[in-house]
């Protein structure tokens, strides 16, 4: 099946299944795959250790700003690099959305840090074409914790439900008013993309002329 969209972005909280679905779609839709590279961030493991202390009183980490600036600059380099320019000649499926940078920054940085982050962000003058389709994967924080434990990345073991709920709330707020691209919302508590029936229904939905915001609820 050909991909009718120049670019498709799969987004959602950590552990929700972005990379799995993006990889499947790239194969099914004969598209190039662009994956987030988080393993090179030298601050991420330290940040997640602090996240283990996250609660309603402690809402940030001394590594939060460095973590977010590293991701921002890394992604800016990727989108300006030769590899991405070559990828743009093809249809692309990605497991991250450049907009998520500001979403996470706003969620985890202090007000002073966020102002500094915005100065760096705005100074980069990133001009990236809006996706042809955004797929937003949802589930609850408790389910995410179970999936994170199952995949067994050691430093992710410090992630708490409180932290995940804050990220979920940030995504919900962001996509509530998002209108820049067609938006397909999937609750992965009810939809299993690894199930052949659900996945076939999803491909059928993606192949439609999606406009605005729709929720994917296949019949069982």
Where are these regions (language model features)?
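Hydrophobic anchor at the beta1->P-loop junction of P-loop NTPases
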Residues: 10
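P-loop (Walker A) phosphate-binding loop of NTP-binding proteins
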Residues: 13
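Conserved lysine of the Walker
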Residues: 18
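Conserved substrate/cofactor phosphate-moiety recognition/catalytic segment
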Residues: 27-74
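Glycine-rich phosphate-binding loop used to anchor ATP phosphates in small-molecule kinases
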Residues: 63-129
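A glycine- and Lys/Arg-enriched "phosphate-lid" helix/loop adjacent to the NTP-binding pocket
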Residues: 101-169
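NTP-dependent small-molecule kinase module
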Residues: 146-158, 162-220
